[in-house]
Amino acid sequence: NYYTPDYETKGTDILAAFRMTPQPGVPPEEAGAAVAAESSTGTWTTVWTDGLTSLDRYKGRCYDIEPVAGEEHQFIAYVAYPLDLFEEGSVTNLFTSIVGNVFGFKALRALRLGDLRIPPSYSKTFMGPPHGIQVERDKLNKYGRPFLGCTIKPKLGLSAKNYGRAVYECLRGGLDFTKDDENVNSQPFMRWRDRFLFVAEALFKAQSETGEVKGHYLNATAGTCEEMFKRAIFARELGAPIVMHDYLTGGFTANTSLAYYCRDNGLLLHIHRAMHAVIDRQKNHGMHFRVLAKALRMSGGDHFHSGTVVGKLEGERDITLGFVDLLRDDYIDKDRSRGIYFTQDWVSMPGVLPVASGGIHVWHMPALTEIFGDDSVLQFGGGTLGHPWGNAPGAVANRVALVACV
């Protein structure tokens, strides 16, 4: 009774679109019902305590199934979940239910969560991004163009002093931001406190010489939440405008906690998506990146890596622009051509700046500005530091190319 094709969805339901591949001989209706049951109130048998609650009120319902065009034995199962199944303001609880045990089901060869519709009645229980796009522009006093960034390379092995030197040269050359690589936490060759101190010196020197507000994404990701907060607090005490977090490896609970701290203390929050391809790259199993993007917007982040379309990392143009819109816009219409299964209304939740990063350089600038528009961060690592004349000329080249394109 978890397959209910007559069910009319409510405005408060959380809706999910699963791409499922049933085992041979398993009807799609049975597989869809199993997904709805296991991700809500069901278990492998009937239990007597079912009679002590109203399963009809709390159960998930598979309300529609459609075949995947061009694929044999693959189906899109649409499941509606009542709002009361989920703790308010908790991405952790949302994912524990919807993508928990169900992905290991024997009745399924593969299962992928393609999209989620988050109703305003649930999204309003989340703080969302600490500040959002407009507040960030006001803090930095920069308008009418994308922001320019650079990931410091080599990503591992530099001393703190040489790292700070590279930061200074890039910011002095015209970039708005430099960035810790996601791998950089606090290793023997460069402890986090030393890095923070040399970077702060570089930051303020570049600011005083250029008259522009500059930033460096100081990676606060750590092995414990306590250590993460220690690093974020030290960054704030130094006067840094922005910190960074690896939200998948760090975890949603840690990320949401850090986002609250950043809003309360005036820090911007840059989010890296390290580990995402483990979850989202297979087209038949796992979770699509657009779901991870929606989850991040709720959990909290001001910048988020979204792919480039033109760089070294995988990403189709229309699909990428679909989740860029889901990060930035208030209201996004259903559009299956871009992989958007449901209309999404974020109401007043602040937007997130998409970050284009990965194998891009100045020759990509016309395409990047056309694809991403003004509200974005264009981040060049090797595309800055690989300039034959050095780091500062690489930064100058990026800034000149950007000005020419906008």
Curated annotation (Swiss-Prot):
Family annotation (SUPFAM superfamilies): RuBisCo, C-terminal domain (SSF51649), RuBisCO, large subunit, small (N-terminal) domain (SSF54966)
Cofactor(s) needed by this chain: Mg(2+)
EC number: 4.1.1.39
Binding residue positions for substrate: 101, 151, 155, 273, 305, 357
Catalytic reactions of this protein: 2 (2R)-3-phosphoglycerate + 2 H(+) = D-ribulose 1,5-bisphosphate + CO2 + H2O; D-ribulose 1,5-bisphosphate + O2 = 2-phosphoglycolate + (2R)-3-phosphoglycerate + 2 H(+)
Free-text description of this protein's post-translational modifications in UniProt: The disulfide bond which can form in the large chain dimeric partners within the hexadecamer appears to be associated with oxidative stress and protein turnover.
Molecular functions (GO terms): magnesium ion binding; monooxygenase activity; ribulose-bisphosphate carboxylase activity
Similarity remark: Belongs to the RuBisCO large chain family. Type I subfamily.
Keyword field: Calvin cycle, Carbon dioxide fixation, Chloroplast, Disulfide bond, Lyase, Magnesium, Metal-binding, Monooxygenase, Oxidoreductase, Photorespiration, Photosynthesis, Plastid
Misc. remarks from the entry: The basic functional RuBisCO is composed of a large chain homodimer in a 'head-to-tail' conformation. In form I RuBisCO this homodimer is arranged in a barrel-like tetramer with the small subunits forming a tetrameric 'cap' on each end of the 'barrel'.
Amino acids binding Mg(2+): 179, 181-182
GO cellular component: chloroplast
Protein name in UniProt: Ribulose bisphosphate carboxylase large chain
Pfam families found in the cross-reference section: RuBisCO_large, RuBisCO_large_N
GO biological process: photorespiration; reductive pentose-phosphate cycle
Function: RuBisCO catalyzes two reactions: the carboxylation of D-ribulose 1,5-bisphosphate, the primary event in carbon dioxide fixation, as well as the oxidative fragmentation of the pentose substrate in the photorespiration process. Both reactions occur simultaneously and in competition at the same active site.
Residue(s) at site: Transition state stabilizer: 312
Active site location: 153 (proton acceptor), 272 (proton acceptor)
Subunit and partners: Heterohexadecamer of 8 large chains and 8 small chains; disulfide-linked. The disulfide link is formed within the large subunit homodimers.
Cellular localization per UniProt: Plastid, Chloroplast
Record's cofactor remark: Binds 1 Mg(2+) ion per subunit.
N6-carboxylysine sites (modified residues): 179
